[in-house]
Amino acid sequence: MFRRIAGFSPIFLMLFGSSLPTMGNPVKREIHPDAVFYKEHKLRNDGLVITTNQGNIRLQFKSEAAIEVLYRADSKQLPSFALAQPESAIKAQLTETENHLQFSGGTLTARIQKRPFAISYYRDSELLLAEESGFQVNTDKINFRFYLSPGEKILGGGQRILGMDRRGQRFPLYNRAHYGYSDHSGQMYFGLPAIMSSKQYILVFDNSASGAMDIGKTESDILQLEAKSGRSAYILVAGNSYPSLIENFTQVTGRQPLPPRWALGSFASRFGYRSEAETRATVQKYKTEDFPLDTIVLDLYWFGKDIKGHMGNLDWDKENFPTPLDMMADFKQQGVKTVLITEPFVLTSSKRWDDAVKAKALAKDPQGQPKAFELYFGNGGIIDVFSKEGSRWFSSIYKDLSKQGVAGWWGDLGEPEMHPEDTQHAIGDADTVHNAYGHRWAEMLYQQQLDQFPELRPFIMMRAGFVGSQRYGMIPWTGDVSRTWGGLASQVELALQMSLLGFGYIHSDLGGFADGETLDKEMYIRWLQYGVFQPVYRPHGQDHIPSEPVFQDEETKAILRPLVKLRYRMLPYIYTAAYQNTLTGMPLMRPLFFSDEKNPALIDNKTSYFWGDSLLVTPITQAGVESVSIPAPKGVWFDFWKDTRYQTDGAPLTLPTDLHTIPVLVKAGAFMPYVPAVSTTEDYRSDSLEIHYYADASVPLAQGEIFEDDGKDPNSIKRNQFDLLTLQATHTDNQLHFQLARTGKGYRGMPERRATTLVIHNASDQYQHLDINGKTIAIAQADCASTPALACYDQERRQLQLVFTWGREALNLRLH
């Protein structure tokens, strides 16, 4: 077995400097008789293979900043689920001394001590991470052990409510439902065997088995990654900043493809619509109440009238949904898409049990027969998505339903919620593959949808997955949260933790899902206000309390209606953040510590976040709040609602609150684009564009961008079929200069010219003239809302408004 218990040798420190003790001074130990020793090495095209007295170890650089380390490389192992291209490797430089090997990809370097065997990792000359006793095999588990540095903060582990810094915690690596959670949970639906360090590295335990992560809980300076079985590999990624770290990480684990634009619109959802009549009435209610709507989501009643006994039917209950194809076609004409829930379980009482058995689609018991077991919904089995037969059978069902008009898919219970340990899948038993089940399900469905509709982006919402599942378009949510203030308060932490490790579209059941005897009106309003400024706007909950805003009282509707419409007006901003996520992995929701990477205290903040490039959002998560303390980073900020200017040295701002809005700040130098509100994204147009610029002398140079395409084509970026509007503002003592340009080949339906209004906030009254590409226009001093001038200045609001047409040509606007 692999085992090493030893300190670092003096020779190592002489060769590679004295930075190693910054990990903390390891206790010097005698070399253990089971220690691993180097025997020889071979540099191959696929990496460096080191032979030791206990087997082979393979090191592969996946990029200049990412390395995969596979122990027991000479034995048969499960494939990597985390890596987007597990077989690829880049060439790296190898140097050797008598006692050490140095293997470098560029940004990241592995330094290998031969006797006893040990690997340490450097970013340039800075020690990032070192194995303590490397890889170990015990009778009941395998594990890796690494040193933690003094003061090092650790994020990660996926969905947990433990505080942002997870150091000092030990928790299971086993996806499991936590029904009705509130403000604490150590084990939830979607865990991740990965961490992000304040030293700006990400470490992934590329193992799908049941296990645990111990982040300095048992031993304060030791990180231990454990699993019952499975792949003995880890991936280390380095960066020079948090954004570059995320970019490097998603380069090797895969980037989230752009979702369809409609995924960013308004959803109607509950548990659940029990009939076609109720579903139609809900869509009509949105129209009657003048609320935008893009999607209606059908929970499990679409295939059976009861919660129990029907799972696995995977076909319409014609008694309660007599004309589902007509229903979906009617919705489509109104710009409303239909999303159906599916689960991976097939009950013995369902219509498809015999067919699934005949098709060999189900996982097996140890005797090779279809495994049946008890779950909440009845007795049944689980589809083996790891087998060709199971994938083929499940895919054919999705194909048939998609042909009928289903526009997107909701995959529920994919932890899996029930997964007996003696269940046998095609590639391993339940405990070995458990955490990769949702990942493989998403991969299968994503490929099936692209094969069937190569010109459309799939919509796949799932409750569980693995590191890298984002590359299959997975849109996860945070599960069955309780209808409590604690449930709402936990959502920022959950979203940020998942977003940092690739899942930019993580979101919650707005309003809460579980329990609650009656509606808490204030909490509901606050949750749906928060929802406007997070990735997916989807109210959802048990149906004894209506989830949808259209079924609330008049005051609630009056508060929420303009906010939902605002989200539609802000779609260019939200969609551009989605584009950035696809391009670089940058999350849509971003933590405050991105603003000051040298301030580790910001890592602990879980009350506020950046929404896209320019907005700082602070949800209200307590009842009766009259003012909120906002940890605004140093600089100039503007109140999004009132336009008030604030300057802070980094001390928190205290803002009064009311029931109509939550605190949102805009950073100085921000460009905020808007389009006219529509009732569905099918009517989305950007031929009329409003751009708000928040001017301030503290920002002499500002840049922004707006990404536009057809909202559907999965290859729009690859084919350059988009319109990227770039914006730059240069501020001097007596002039403000804007440069506007467009790049990209364009897309079907793209406006050649846009009627553009540029609104400059905090504008000086010194400007008298506007030059547009050399043509001079006098600036009128008037109320811009009632003055049809091409350029006007509103003294009371301190806003300057410019109206012009923006075609394909670049524009230079100069205020003087």
From Swiss-Prot:
Class in the EC hierarchy, top level: transferase
Q: Which residues form the active site?
A: 412 (nucleophile), 415, 480 (proton donor)
> Which reaction(s) are listed as its catalytic activity?
Transfers the non-reducing terminal alpha-D-glucose residue from a (1->4)-alpha-D-glucan to the 4-position of a free glucose or of a glucosyl residue at the non-reducing terminus of a (1->4)-alpha-D-glucan, thus bringing about the rearrangement of oligosaccharides
Q: What is the protein name stated in its UniProt record? A: Oligosaccharide 4-alpha-D-glucosyltransferase
Q: Which UniProt keywords apply?
A: Glycosyltransferase, Signal, Transferase
The organism named in the record is: Cellvibrio japonicus (strain Ueda107) (Pseudomonas fluorescens subsp. cellulosa)
Which family does the UniProt entry place this protein in? Belongs to the glycosyl hydrolase 31 family.
The UniProt function text for this chain reads: Alpha-transglucosylase that specifically transfers single glucosyl units from alpha(1->4)-glucans to the non-reducing terminal 4-OH of glucose and alpha(1->4)- and alpha(1->6)-linked glucosyl residues. Acts on amylose, amylopectin, glycogen and maltooligosaccharides, with the highest activity with maltotriose as a donor, and also accepts maltose. Does not act as a hydrolase: weak hydrolysis activity is only observed on the disaccharide maltose.
Question: Per the UniProt entry, what is one GO biological process?
Answer: carbohydrate metabolic process
Which residues does the record give as acarbose binding sites?
299, 417, 463, 480, 540
Q: Known Pfam families for this protein?
A: DUF5110, Gal_mutarotas_2, Glyco_hydro_31_2nd, Glyco_hydro_31_3rd
> Which CDD domains does its entry note?
GH31_N (cd14752), GH31_transferase_CtsZ (cd06598)
Q: What is its EC number?
A: 2.4.1.161
Query: Domain of life here?
Result: Bacteria
The UniProt GO MF terms for this protein read:
carbohydrate binding; hydrolase activity, hydrolyzing O-glycosyl compounds; oligosaccharide 4-alpha-D-glucosyltransferase activity
